[in-house]
Amino acid sequence: MNYDFDTVTDRKNTNAIKYDLAKKRGKPEDAVSLWVADMDFPTAPCIQKAVAEKAAHGIWGYSRPDNRYYDALKKWYKERHNFEVQNEWVVNTPGVCFALATAVKAFTNEGESVLIQKPVYYPFFNITNSLQRKVVNSSLILKNNHYEIDFDDFERKIVQENVKMFILCSPHNPGGRVWTKQELQKISEICLAHNVLVVSDEIHSDITFGSNVHTVYGSLSEQALKNSIICTAPSKSFNLAGLQFSNIFIADEKLRKAFSEELDKTGYDEPSVFGIVAATAAYSEGADWFDSVKSYIWENILFAKKYIEENASQIKVLVPEGTYLLWLDFSKTGLSDSEINDRVLNKAKVWLDSGSMFGKEGEKFQRINCATPRIILEDALKRICSQF
């Protein structure tokens, strides 16, 4: 089936934070918004149909997933990731960040250490800090436009800081790495050796390109499976973030019980009725749409790389192995981080995520969302390149 990803859908005045928060956050209201990680495409027709039918039913009371959801979820992970999910492993939460916070509260105490790898998705350290845990950082190493893990530093920090939990970003946001099985196995070996629980944020796991293959952390070994909390959701793959629905895989019964007990303390019980319906439709009927949108996004990424190389060659493009996020390196411009931010936001009038939001290691970088109609992406690139 052919899908139209070129038509622009006006999202202004729809309560979309990507567009309607500009004034509140002091951003130019005429800026092109490519900051937050949601798509500018309507979701798959099969999902729209399923949600519309549920809306027409008119009764949206407390709901829980049934076997249609579990069967679709298991089929998706088996076919896409060769990972066999068991029904009892699945805990639903209203978002992956909610699950991260729940895990930090359930498995660490105030003052204990949680390891992350900057530059990284900023809720990792914002949530950890807000819960009065100690953030320990093992910075990724950038070599030839490619991030690598410093395993010596990784293990040293775990030992020195008595780390209790490691939050893994897989695939990596914002750097776009799809970690190899060998890299993940090394992480697992170190964490198992030092009794460090792994919380793996795999929300972008479906979105990989070329020969890059996502490895579900729990597929590494039985020990890795039982020492991990794997956070997944249909939100990035199918543009469903606003429905607040995630699938958290916890194979170990004791971990799952502790996580669920912490979840209960928040007052959260049943997931969104529309989240259940949308996720079920996505995983059971959405494959063709997803494959099409992923191809379109990859074409956008290649378009952006070529455009920047031809019009602002001092900006270096880190081509992602996964995610629809492009990480742009402005360090060769000779400008300071604040000067780069000012040129992009106030002169080019493009609202991106400043790299410094992801940690000091992200200074002089900008993150741009490529899940948008090409005409919007081209407009943003023209504006940016005109200032550098």
Identify the function of each model-found stretch.
Residues G334-S336, R343-L352, F358-F388:
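PLP-dependent enzyme catalytic core of the Aspartate aminotransferase-like
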Residues W60-E189, D206-I207, H214-S219, Q223:
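Conserved core of the PLP fold type I
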Residues K49-A50, E222, K226-W298, K306, ...:
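Conserved core segment of the aminotransferase class I/II
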Residues T280, Y296-K305, V317-F330, G362:
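Conserved glycine-rich beta-strand-loop-beta hairpin in the small C-terminal domain of fold type I
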Residues N2-G95, T102:
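N-terminal small-domain helix-loop-helix segment of the aminotransferase-like
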Residues L131, E161, A193-H194, N311, ...:
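Helix C-cap/helix->beta junction micro-motif
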